[in-house]
Regions:
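GST-like domain detector, emphasizing the conserved glutathione-binding G-site
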Residues: 1-128, 142
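A generic structural-conservation signal
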Residues: 27, 154, 178, 198-199
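Active-site-flanking alpha-helical
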Residues: 72, 165-166, 199
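Residue-level recognition of oxygen-bearing side chains
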Residues: 66, 181, 194
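Charged/polar, low-hydrophobicity segments characteristic of intrinsically disordered regions
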Residues: 134, 193-201
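GST-like fold's C-terminal all-alpha helical module
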Residues: 99-191
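Short, solvent-exposed alpha-helical surface patches in well-structured domains
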Residues: 91-94, 184, 197
Length: 201
């Protein structure tokens, strides 16, 4: 498998899973914003010119959640996903999709308003609203983590999705002083060798 990868991007989620499963793969490394990702040769793989994109023989797939579901379904041997009839499975689905449904939309606004836009184009109202909503979304995860080591109890792909989003929120400068369970959760995730490797590629 060939993973098109950039540090501090959602591609880390995919590399994390590949490392947890100890699957062989190679990476094509970019920096976020690289012109190479906007070239037609890459847009044939990913029309949006973004990472991650995974090539598995003739198959090409993008979107981190879709890639993770594909890898687990094809190569996971039932690892990192609860049994479908278990009481944990619905919770797993909820937390797997919480990253992109609830956390990342607010983070995207914050990144645009604080990094991508020039100062004279920034909207402080949008930024304040996104920060408030992101904190609210993280509070829900905080409450869930009160009596758990991982989102559904056992470590799963939901942690690779939403756990990664939580870490990125912290890296973005969101205040975690009133989120002690998330602070512990982040430390627990960052201690995993597979994530250490995925983040350092």
């Amino acid at each position: 498998m060939l993973l098109h990868y950039a540090q501090n991007s959602r591609a880390v989620r995919v590399a994390w899973l590949l490392e947890e499963l100890n699957l062989p793969y190679t990476i094509k490394k970019y920096k976020l914003g690289d012109k190479e990702m906007r070239e037609e040769s890459y847009k044939k793989l990913n029309p949006l010119g973004r990472v991650p994109t995974l090539e598995d023989n003739e198959l090409i797939i993008s979107e981190s959640g879709a890639i993770i579901q594909y890898i687990i379904s094809k190569y996971g041997n039932n690892q990192f996903i609860p049994e479908i009839n278990s009481k944990e499975f619905p919770s797993y689905l909820q937390w797997f999709h919480y990253a992109e449904g609830m956390i990342m939309p607010q983070m995207n606004i914050i990144v645009v308003e604080t990094i991508f836009l020039p100062p004279d184009k920034r909207n402080e109202v949008n930024l304040a609203r996104a920060n408030k909503l992101l904190s609210k979304m993280l509070d829900v995860v905080e409450k869930n983590m009160e009596n758990k080591n991982y989102l559904t109890g056992e470590f799963s792909a939901a942690d690779m999705m939403t756990g990664h989003a939580v870490i990125m929120s912290k890296n973005l400068g969101i205040d975690f002083s009133n989120k002690p369970f998330l602070e512990s959760y982040i430390k627990r995730l960052l201690s995993r060798p597979a994530l250490k490797k995925a983040w350092s590629l």
